[in-house]
């Protein structure tokens, strides 16, 4: 087994939220499914998003300089598939309801949370760009259950029975 395949297999065991990352601006509207998204800091609120430079959406995200990370809820599996494949952009966005955040990037109605961001810095790493994104607006939906990708499958999350004290 190659080192690359061993790494991919190991990463399949690392559960992650499923997100649709969207943008709209001078270069047009685009979106893709991503699990390579995480918090960087809360001062100021910043996320990182990893985007393959060979992806068809890369030039649009690069030119627009803004995006929205929409964390998917249970029941969004088909939508994730649309945004993760070669489906034409119009069909992707036609499959759900959207609103606009402060940047104008599409925010998914029914998402667990949407982070509307301005891209502050781009760090190239091998085949990908790491986008450091300043969060400008957060829209939460506390009535939904999360969706994670683990072991190359979707898993719906339910509300915890108990949690840690704040």
UniProtKB/Swiss-Prot annotation:
GO terms for biological process: nitrogen utilization; uracil catabolic process. It is an enzyme of class 1 (oxidoreductase). InterPro entries: Flavin_Rdtase-like_dom (IPR002563), NADH-dep_flavin_reductase (IPR050268), RutF (IPR019917), Split_barrel_FMN-bd (IPR012349). It catalyses: FMNH2 + NAD(+) = FMN + NADH + 2 H(+). The keyword Nucleus does not apply. GO terms for molecular function: FMN binding; FMN reductase (NADH) activity; FMN reductase [NAD(P)H] activity; riboflavin reductase (NADPH) activity. Pfam families: Flavin_Reduct. Keywords: Flavoprotein, FMN, NAD, Oxidoreductase. SUPFAM superfamilies: FMN-binding split barrel. Its EC number is 1.5.1.42. SMART domains: Flavin_Reduct. Belongs to the non-flavoprotein flavin reductase family. RutF subfamily. Catalyzes the reduction of FMN to FMNH2 which is used to reduce pyrimidine by RutA via the Rut pathway. NCBIfam families: RutF. This is FMN reductase (NADH) RutF. The gene is rutF.
């Amino acid at each position: 087994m190659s080192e690359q395949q061993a790494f991919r297999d190991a990463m399949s065991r690392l559960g992650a939220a499923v997100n649709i990352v969207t943008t709209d601006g001078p270069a047009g509207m685009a979106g893709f499914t991503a699990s390579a998204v995480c918090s960087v800091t809360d001062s100021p609120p910043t996320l990182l998003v990893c985007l393959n430079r060979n992806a068809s959406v890369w030039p649009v995200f690069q030119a627009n300089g803004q995006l929205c990370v929409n964390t998917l809820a249970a029941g969004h599996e088909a939508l994730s598939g649309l945004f993760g494949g070669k489906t034409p952009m119009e069909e992707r966005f036609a499959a759900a309801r959207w609103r606009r955040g402060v940047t104008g990037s599409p925010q998914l109605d029914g998402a667990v949370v949407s982070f509307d961001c301005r891209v502050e810095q781009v760090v190239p790493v091998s085949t990908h760009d790491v986008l450091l994104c300043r969060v400008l607006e957060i829209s939460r939906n506390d009535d939904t259950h999360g969706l994670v990708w683990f072991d190359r499958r979707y898993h719906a999350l339910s509300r915890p029975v108990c949690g840690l004290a704040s």
